[in-house]
């Protein structure tokens, strides 16, 4: 059912089929559905009068014209526009519509003419007409949306007769038919109440407005019956509208007004546009229509085109707003497209603060239109540089925002012509195009290119016009402050950052004067020494050592490829630490603040017995000291005790040759291949204690960072070789081999003297005695133990504590294949090269508790990642303070398998050992394991069996081939082996392994090669280990339980 303004409409077929409530055919002609019952014979006004108390005015309604205008006549004007489109068909349809009389139909039948011939299309057109009429009534006040309905437009009077309201008018004579003007009112109309008649409607039909627009109808009875709503009590605010119906304003401007050609609206009554003040300008429209990113907005408000805003919902309740003292707020709705209003926009682009005289939008000077004269420009103060008095008319029917902008932009006035008496230097439009093509033409026209701010990186501090900086100036332009943070930068910046800073620092001297511009040629006296190592590394030139400086200064000067600042007369020093030389990097200038250099690494002698040791590829690196101890080294003659001062740290030196490391400042480039050495802590007894091992901060095998270190070490050894004449080193052997993986703290420094004597070689035996190691293998009780905790604290050692490196491999083992791990367990069980991360530790679950030592239960840490001092072992008191050496076929009393100490009350027998042994199931079972299994089964079943079982011959070879490498335990023997009984270096290495391995019942001098298990070939009998078995003396036949391994 189609319901319009509380009236039912339906199509013809639905009315005939009695389906009015179900009709939804909005595209068909709609007929009004009459109410049931007898039609009313009186108007609403007469009904109200009759119902009033004591009223007897009339019993029959005589109000209105005798032939009132029907609804069909009102819609005739609407249909005329569509009829004009169809010239032939539309004209005939209009003639037939006016000629065909309306036939009354009975109830339930549609009328002869539909109310809306085109369905809801007519309803929409009437609604659009209602929007077009806003502003015509109530003297510039917006028509309320609730009153702009179809019913109010079709029936402006509440008497619902459809035509001009004639209620309350006494008919004196019959009214004649409308001959000329159908809306003409009789002259003899009676007076109407001052209140406005019976309807009191504020909405007038289109014909009423047309009648009131004529000057002759101002004093007519129609105007009196419907007076203009100009009473002040009906207006809350007085708003200006370009479509004002004020006749006096309209008449005052009608004589001088002219029609603008841009208007194309079909409406006949249109106010003159040129004299209507625009409510908006072009700048406000462009700001609302164009976003900041240059795109068009999706919608624009109505106010930007000059249309008034719509009242809010709360504004309808006028009485409530007046009582509460609230003001109604209008709603600025978006502009609907296509537009149905004609608007005027000002061409001003200055904004709200425009001060141009005669501006159409911002007329602050109140210049009358008759006196307004404009020469085409607003003057120099105009921000828009155009004619602000110009107006831009925008007709209705605009379809989009883009079309609105195009219409407005096409009517913007052109910019004013340039005046010849004034020249704007910033206006480049007056220059010829050849200025941008030729520099000569640009210079002729007065365009001078400015010098770019290249000096000091844009931070020049010189006075204007007095800059004497060079191109490489850092920007200080005076006292350079670039190196104030040098100590911090050496700790934080890398090698490349330091070199980049040196380039900047060297440019600081360009601004300070002639005395600071000395080059590097005065500093450099290149004397390239002969390199002793046949390497391809480049050795940078070094400054020759001054003859009047002590040995410590010489070490400092040769530590890194640096240059000493030449001093004509070095000051006298009282101690070696006071004579630190101030080194300057070659790329730094002479004006750099000197920095104390790093403590040099000392020179260590090499024994003749150690020069032949060659480390196999893939094996462990040498120990921390790089050598095995020797009690026969040449001792120093004489002692010297003094106080060394290094910065603010004073440390006492006790002993003949105690190593001492001076804390020094290291740059990050040095740390790239240096390992932080453990700082020595002075104990109460005067003995240095090693702190926790420092971790590696950078890979040591970096070729880029190691090249400089290798070159420095080569230079150091070559420079000190000539001055080291009193050393005990064998001149026939080469000097100490340079290893890139060696630690910087692995070389204890020499005792420095104040004279010019050569450095004395380091005495290892004296050093070991100073730290508490006696020649008989004991630790002195008056010295605190630094590297090994007490025996009571051994179970509390964390499992991640690093261990000491392994001793060097003897020369007789050089033919062992690479990767062979020289731990004592590998002497019997391991023949597979260890992995890159070092040998793994044997699980603690495979070793009995009584055969497990704290060192053996710890996992092995790769020697590259941790460094400690060599552990010093304290043996039981019953050994007499000597390292036990196996010299007989019996097992050493007090020690069991794997070297774990055993109680004296416990008897170590073969039967108890067999009961305590555990079979390792991680490797294939051999004959010994099968024998133990058989013995266990016999004991469990109560039976007796032979103690020896013959292994399977068929499975022996297969088991040996598939035998995996057994995981080994960490070494528990010290890194530096001190032989208390033998002084011959040739026999030290031969006796080293006999100190840790005992063979029960097998003489050392056996001629059998390899180690056998019950007569079969063992692991040590492999082809790669034949010579190793001979060297170690592990020949002959022995059972699995005959090997005894222990450690001190």
Swiss-Prot record:
Residues 85-99, 835-845 have a biased composition (Low complexity). It is found in: Nucleus; Cytoplasm, Cell cortex. Disulfide bonds: none annotated. Residues 211-222, 527-536, 550-565, 629-645, 664-682, 692-702, 846-868 have a biased composition (Polar residues). Disruption phenotype: Leads to a clear defect in the ability to grow in both copper excess or copper deficiency conditions. Impairs the activation of laccase LAC1 transcription by copper. Also reduces the expression of the genes coding for the copper transporters CTR1 and CTR4, and the metallothioneins CMT1 and CMT2. Impairs the induction of the copper acquisition factor BIM1 under copper-limiting conditions. Impairs induction of super oxide dismutase SOD2 under copper-limiting conditions. Impairs repression of super oxide dismutase SOD1 under copper-limiting conditions. One of its GO terms (biological process) is intracellular copper ion homeostasis. InterPro entries: Copper_Homeo_Regul, Cu_fist_DNA-bd_dom, Cu_fist_DNA-bd_dom_sf. A motif (CRM-II) lies at residues 455-482. One of its GO terms (molecular function) is copper ion binding. The keyword Nuclease does not apply. Zn(2+) binds at residues 11, 14, 23, 25. GO terms for cellular component: cell cortex; chromatin; nucleus. Transcription factor that regulates copper acquisition and homeostasis, and which plays a central role in fungal pathogenesis during neurologic infection. The transcriptional regulation exerted by CUF1 is intrinsically complex since it acts as a dual sensor of copper levels, responsible for expression of a set of copper-specific copper transporters, CTR1 and CTR4, at low copper concentrations, and 2 metallothioneins, CMT1 and CMT2, at high copper concentrations. Positively regulates the expression of the copper acquisition factor BIM1 under copper-limiting conditions. PANTHER family: TRANSCRIPTIONAL ACTIVATOR HAA1-RELATED. This is Copper-dependent transcription factor 1. The gene is CUF1.
């Amino acid at each position: 059912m189609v319901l319009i303004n509380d009236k039912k409409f339906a199509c013809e077929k639905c009315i005939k089929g009695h389906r009015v409530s179900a009709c939804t055919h909005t595209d068909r002609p709609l007929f009004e559905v009459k109410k049931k019952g007898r039609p009313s014979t009186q108007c609403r006004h007469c009904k109200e009068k009759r119902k009033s108390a004591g009223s007897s005015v009339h019993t029959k309604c005589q109000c209105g014209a005798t032939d009132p205008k029907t609804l069909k006549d009102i819609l005739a004007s609407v249909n005329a526009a569509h009829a004009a489109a169809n010239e032939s068909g539309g004209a005939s349809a209009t003639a037939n519509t006016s000629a065909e009389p309306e036939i009354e139909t009975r109830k339930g039948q549609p009328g002869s003419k539909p109310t809306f011939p085109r369905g809801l299309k007519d309803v929409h057109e009437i609604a659009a007409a209602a929007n077009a009429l806003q502003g015509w009534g109530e003297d510039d006040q917006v028509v309320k949306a609730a009153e702009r309905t179809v019913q109010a437009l079709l029936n402006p009077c509440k008497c619902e007769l459809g035509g001009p309201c004639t209620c309350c008018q006494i008919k004196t004579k019959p009214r004649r038919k409308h001959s000329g003007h159908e809306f003409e009112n009789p002259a003899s109309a009676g007076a109407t109440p001052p209140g406005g008649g019976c309807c009191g409607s504020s909405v007038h039909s289109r014909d009423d407005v047309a009648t009131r627009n004529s000057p002759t109808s101002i004093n007519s009875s129609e105007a009196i019956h419907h007076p203009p709503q100009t009473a002040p009590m009906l207006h809350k605010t007085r708003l200006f509208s370009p479509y004002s119906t004020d006749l006096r304003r309209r008449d005052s401007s009608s004589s001088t007004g002219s029609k603008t050609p841009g208007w194309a609206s079909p409406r006949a009554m249109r106010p003159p546009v040129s004299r209507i003040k625009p409510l908006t300008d072009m700048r406000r429209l462009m700001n609302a229509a164009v976003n900041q990113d240059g795109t068009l907005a999706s919608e624009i408000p109505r106010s930007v085109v000059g249309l008034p805003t719509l009242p809010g919902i709360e504004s309808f309740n006028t009485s409530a707003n007046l009582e509460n003292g609230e003001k109604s707020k209008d709603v600025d709705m978006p502009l609907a497209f296509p537009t149905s209003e004609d608007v005027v926009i000002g061409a001003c682009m200055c904004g709200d603060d425009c001060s141009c005289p005669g501006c159409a939008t911002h007329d602050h000077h109140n210049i009358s239109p008759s006196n307004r004269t404009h020469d085409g420009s607003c003057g120099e103060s105009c921000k828009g540089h155009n004619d602000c008095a110009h107006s831009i008319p925008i007709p209705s029917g605009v379809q989009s925002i883009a079309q609105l902008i195009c219409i407005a932009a096409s009517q913007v006035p052109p910019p004013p012509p340039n005046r010849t008496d004034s020249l704007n230097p910033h206006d480049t439009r007056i220059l010829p195009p050849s200025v941008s093509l030729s520099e000569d033409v640009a210079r002729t026209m007065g365009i001078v290119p400015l010098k770019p701010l290249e000096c000091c990186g844009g931070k020049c501090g010189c006075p204007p016009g007095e800059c004497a900086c060079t191109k490489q100036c850092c920007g200080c332009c005076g006292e350079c402050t670039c190196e104030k943070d040098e100590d911090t930068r050496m700790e934080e910046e890398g090698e490349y950052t330091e070199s980049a800073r040196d380039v900047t620092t060297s440019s600081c001297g360009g601004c300070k004067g002639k005395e600071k511009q000395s080059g590097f040629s005065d500093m450099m006296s290149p004397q390239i020494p002969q390199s002793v190592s046949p390497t391809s590394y480049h050795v940078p030139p070094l400054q020759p050592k001054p003859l009047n400086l002590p040995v410590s200064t010489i070490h400092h000067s040769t530590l890194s490829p640096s240059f000493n600042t030449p001093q004509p007369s070095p000051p006298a020093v009282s101690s070696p630490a006071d004579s630190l030389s101030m080194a300057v990097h070659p790329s730094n200038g002479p004006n750099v603040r000197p920095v104390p250099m790093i403590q040099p690494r000392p020179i260590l002698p090499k024994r003749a017995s150690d020069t032949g040791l060659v480390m196999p590829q893939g094996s462990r690196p040498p120990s921390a000291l790089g050598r095995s101890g020797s009690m026969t080294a040449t001792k120093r003659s004489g002692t010297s005790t003094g106080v060394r001062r290094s910065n603010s740290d004073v440390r006492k030196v006790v002993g003949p040759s105690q190593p001492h490391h001076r804390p020094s400042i290291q740059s990050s480039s040095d740390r790239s291949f240096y390992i932080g050495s453990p700082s020595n802590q002075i104990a109460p007894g005067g003995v240095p204690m090693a702190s926790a091992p420092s971790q590696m901060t950078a890979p040591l095998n970096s070729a880029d960072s190691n090249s400089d270190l290798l070159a420095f070490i080569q230079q150091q050894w070559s420079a000190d070789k000539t001055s080291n004449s009193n050393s005990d080193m064998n001149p026939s052997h080469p000097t100490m081999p340079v290893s890139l993986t060696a630690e910087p703290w692995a070389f204890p420094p020499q005792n420095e003297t104040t004279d010019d004597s050569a450095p004395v070689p380091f005495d290892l035996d004296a050093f070991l005695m100073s730290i508490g190691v006696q020649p008989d293998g004991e630790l002195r009780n008056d010295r605190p133990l630094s590297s090994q905790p007490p025996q009571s604290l051994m179970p509390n050692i964390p499992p991640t504590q690093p261990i000491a490196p392994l001793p060097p491999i003897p020369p007789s083992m050089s033919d062992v294949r690479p990767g062979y791990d020289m731990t004592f367990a590998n002497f019997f069980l391991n023949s597979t090269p260890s992995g890159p991360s070092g040998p793994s530790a044997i699980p603690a679950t495979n070793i009995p508790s009584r055969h497990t030592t704290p060192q053996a239960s710890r996992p092995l840490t790769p020697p590259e990642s941790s460094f400690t001092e060599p552990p010093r072992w304290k043996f039981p008191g019953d050994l007499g303070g000597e390292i036990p050496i196996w010299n007989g076929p019996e097992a050493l009393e007090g020690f069991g398998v794997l070297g774990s100490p055993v109680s004296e009350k416990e008897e170590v027998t073969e039967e108890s050992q067999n009961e305590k042994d555990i079979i390792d199931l991680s490797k294939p079972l051999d004959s010994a394991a099968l024998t133990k299994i058989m013995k266990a089964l016999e004991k469990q079943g109560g039976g007796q069996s032979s103690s020896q079982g013959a292994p399977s011959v068929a499975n022996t070879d297969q088991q040996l081939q598939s035998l995996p490498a057994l995981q080994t335990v960490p070494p528990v023997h010290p890194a530096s082996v001190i032989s208390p009984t033998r002084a011959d270096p040739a026999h030290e290495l031969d006796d080293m392994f006999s100190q840790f391995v005992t063979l029960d019942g097998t003489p050392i001098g056996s001629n059998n090669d390899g180690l056998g298990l019950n007569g079969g070939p063992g692991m040590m009998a492999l082809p790669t280990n034949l010579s190793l078995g001979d060297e170690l003396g592990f020949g002959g036949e022995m059972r699995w339980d005959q090997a005894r391994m222990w450690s001190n």
